[in-house]
């Protein structure tokens, strides 16, 4: 009888873990050129939902397994604004109380991992890989971040999965503009963009062969290893940002193109408004998110001429979508951030539905290696 009661208690405990509150770790980086505004928003909403949440910054963060095999993460204190006061060398280094981790109840949002060796440290990527090896659910996984860190990889995946997108070719050297133009087989105006970039930065309007060649040469003069894309221009009055979570669209907004510009990014002056999607647009957004292996993504597209019948043109998928803008736009209806967090009460939405730690592929016991002073 006692054995049956214990088995039933274990069953109930397992079901509660599958459909209930979880613990949330937010790993991010507060860059002076790209402030971490979404991280504090997620912390705020998670606390309102009574979730245990820990904010950590990649700079200075380290993780370890203790003698009992328990995983912990340490971080400098992260302020309410997402900023992290870094050590100066004049005062003792202080860490937050370490956060206990377990893949059965800890969800990790790793925002701001960027591109290893280019816009972020390789160690940030490596730390995320350790967590993946141990069965943690990552929002998003390292593969998704790599897929989305390059607009060219976005295009490759779109084509592989037959997702409608503007014609795009890559310009691989400073004298490659003319050849790329011929391969694209599209008329001016065209869009020139760097493969790595966000918020509309690095996107250029090109109206002639002369300006195309001159701009490409200038870009390669500044950085000989830059990747430059040439893309057909799809005329539109607005584009759309949809937030896709575990196979569902939880919110969307329309971003009108500001007067005198061709970009619709909020950072470039667009004033977004709520926007309802058609069934076709919803289905295609979900496919686009799946193509990059994303669990929570921001999907950007230009609507088709007939939104009910014509597939939209997908521009890119973002693996760390900013939520401040869409939260503000939809706040009278609901909180997008809260809806995202609520989705993961259901453990079946977690990546591979982890049940227990996998210690067969762990990294070093302490990462990065620390000295006695913790640095």
Show which residues each predicted segment covers.
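Conserved N-proximal alpha/beta basic substrate-recognition cap immediately N-terminal to
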Residues: 31-167
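Active-site nucleotide/adenylate-binding loops and adjacent lid/helix of ATP-dependent enzymes
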Residues: 16-19, 24-28, 128, 133-134, ...
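C-terminal active-site "lid" helix and adjoining low-complexity regulatory extension at the edge
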Residues: 4, 8-14, 276, 290, ...
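Protein kinase-like catalytic core scaffold
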Residues: 190, 251, 297, 313-316
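Short glycine-enriched loops at secondary-structure junctions
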Residues: 143-148, 249, 255-256, 302-308
